[in-house]
Amino acid sequence: MTEASSDHTALVLFSGGQDSATCLAWALSRFARVEMIGFDYGQRHAVELDCRAKLLDGFRAISPEWAAKLGDSHTLAIPTLSAISDTALTRDVEIAMGADGLPNTFVPGRNLIFLTFAAALAYRRGIADIVGGMCETDYSGYPDCRDDTIRALQNAISLGMARDVKLHTPLMWRDKAATWQLAQDLGGSALVDLIVEHSHTCYLGERGARHDWGYGCGECPACALRAKGWREYSAKAR
């Protein structure tokens, strides 16, 4: 993870999920100004994008300092990603493991595309620091979440844009329990409660069932990881 600078602006990949909300808090605690970018790529759980507004309202309520730092929130439509992908995140099919050992929720190239588009927007807006919630500690095995992938992409983007671009991944070596703890450390119980209530993780887009860790089907891999992390975090917090 590249060191952050307190006098710079950062662009955070902000989907409306637990990880991106935690990364937003991390960026707000380290940068002078923070902008956000989300992607509409035809995902089944597009409800996550709708969660961003309430999350941002919550961030403003938690801290006047955070409120003053929050900048523009951008949304980019990438329908082509859904058109070329045949996955459980972009099709109404059952979630299962593929023959290659990866779950069929893996959207090939998704994070590579997200970060490249984010870097293009950041270039136009004079931003050199980009923050993403990629993690290879407690994850589904996606190869584009690995640290070596992110470091290689950082080098490629910096070379291709002739500018020193920094990709920050504050969750890379944290499991989900540690991610919950980081939210607690950054924003106290108010931030944890905000993430529980208004962030979205469930791959199926389920918002009807409320659990102690938030909303979701409770069965998909994303819900399972979030629930497991919550149980471990809660046990340590007692």
From Swiss-Prot:
One example of a Gene Ontology biological process annotation: queuosine biosynthetic process
Superkingdom of origin: Bacteria
InterPro entries xrefs: QueC, Rossmann-like_a/b/a_fold
Family, as annotated: Belongs to the QueC family.
Reactions that this protein is recorded to catalyse: 7-carboxy-7-deazaguanine + NH4(+) + ATP = 7-cyano-7-deazaguanine + ADP + phosphate + H2O + H(+)
Name listed for the protein in its UniProt record: 7-cyano-7-deazaguanine synthase
HAMAP family reported in the protein's UniProt record: QueC
EC number, as in UniProt: 6.3.4.20
Keyword Zinc listed: yes
Lineage: Bacteria, Pseudomonadati, Pseudomonadota, Alphaproteobacteria, Hyphomicrobiales
Binding residues annotated for ATP, in chain numbering: 14-24
